[in-house]
């Protein structure tokens, strides 16, 4: 298995760079993947195959952030048209549109799907009650520059944000007050909270760092070969993957930081990386306008990947064919 070649599935359809992606939880019908693109058209796909399901049309500018609720019945998007939108992910119809005063960079649902949080270039975080969409949102202020990422945390009683002011902040939802903070030497390009909520993964420059989410203490930190724009930790915390400016996807051992393997498939820098909820694959989005799905265990039968176990005879014949010299045609 270790010597098999990684063959990613390429998901086309977007016409501009893919800048963000997100998976749903595992549902009765599988799990789903949504992508954000500068073409302004978020796309929904079957998560394990990459098959296109539909496109959410309505934004009038680049889409920077997307999210699916756990059940994959609702989608959200934030865009350069100063709007955050909530969609019926089954019908593809717009349900809500929340006007902002600047570009919306990040959106996320609460785990109960009743609330939407947004982060924007206004330097503000907002929480909207989706059962009372006309009500004024709860607003959190404190960042000195635009907000790149925001997510609910700790059973929805807290929020985590990171922004262009080189900080990561934890907020108490009830009081709206900042309760913890991290300062970075450079702008954090990505932020991910592990499925169990215990680990925060961040990237800045060529550094991938893992933090204890409760105390914001550093668990481990690794230096990558190039600037890393995004990283994702496997659900079982055994490995992590990351991608960045050199077009490659990297896989590392979480405990030691040892590079396990790297693959080149994209034709532009990698902007976003995420593991599927079952950990069997990871998805990447790139400047080249495509998403690619990569197997965590190369050669395993899963989704559209089919593995044929080779008998010794087949392996011997394959070796003969591989060593056979080609004869030029007359």
Can you say where each PLM-predicted feature lies in the sequence?
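A short beta-strand motif characteristic of beta-propeller blades
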Residues: 7-11, 51-56, 93-97, 134-140, ...
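Beta-strand-rich domains and repeat architectures in extracellular enzymes and scaffolds
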Residues: 11-40
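Terminal intrinsically disordered, low-complexity extensions flanking WD-repeat/beta-propeller proteins
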Residues: 259-262, 267-269, 277-280, 287-330
């Amino acid at each position: 298995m270790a010597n098999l070649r990684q063959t990613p599935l390429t998901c086309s359809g977007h016409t501009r760079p893919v800048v963000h992606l997100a998976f749903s939880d595992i549902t009765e019908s599988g799990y789903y993947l949504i992508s954000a693109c500068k073409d302004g058209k978020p796309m929904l796909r079957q998560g394990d195959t990459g098959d296109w399901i539909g496109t959410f049309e309505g934004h009038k500018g680049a889409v920077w952030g997307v999210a699916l609720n756990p059940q994959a019945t609702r989608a959200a998007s934030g865009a350069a048209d100063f709007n955050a939108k909530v969609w019926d992910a089954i019908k593809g119809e717009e349900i809500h549109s929340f006007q902002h005063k600047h570009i919306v960079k990040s959106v996320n649902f609460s785990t109960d799907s009743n609330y939407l949080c947004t982060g924007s270039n206004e330097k503000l975080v907002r929480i909207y009650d989706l059962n009372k969409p006309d009500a004024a949102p709860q607003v959190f202020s404190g960042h000195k520059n635009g907000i790149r990422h925001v997510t609910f945390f700790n059973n929805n009683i807290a929020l985590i944000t990171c922004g262009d002011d080189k900080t990561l902040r934890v907020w108490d939802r009830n009081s709206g007050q900042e309760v913890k903070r991290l300062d970075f030497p450079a702008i954090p390009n990505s932020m991910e909270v592990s499925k169990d909520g215990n680990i925060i993964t961040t990237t800045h420059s060529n550094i991938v760092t893992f933090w204890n989410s409760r105390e914001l203490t550093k668990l481990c930190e690794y230096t990558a070969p190039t600037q890393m724009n995004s990283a994702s930790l496997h659900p079982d915390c055994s490995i992590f993957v990351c991608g960045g400016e050199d077009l490659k996807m990297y896989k590392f051992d979480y405990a030691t930081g040892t590079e396990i393997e790297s693959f080149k498939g994209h034709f532009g820098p990698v902007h976003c990386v995420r593991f599927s909820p079952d950990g069997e694959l990871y998805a990447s989005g790139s400047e080249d306008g495509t998403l690619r799905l990569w197997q965590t265990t190369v050669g395993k039968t899963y989704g559209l990947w089919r593995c044929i176990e080779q008998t010794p005879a087949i392996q011997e014949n394959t070796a003969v064919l591989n060593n056979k010299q080609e004869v030029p045609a007359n």
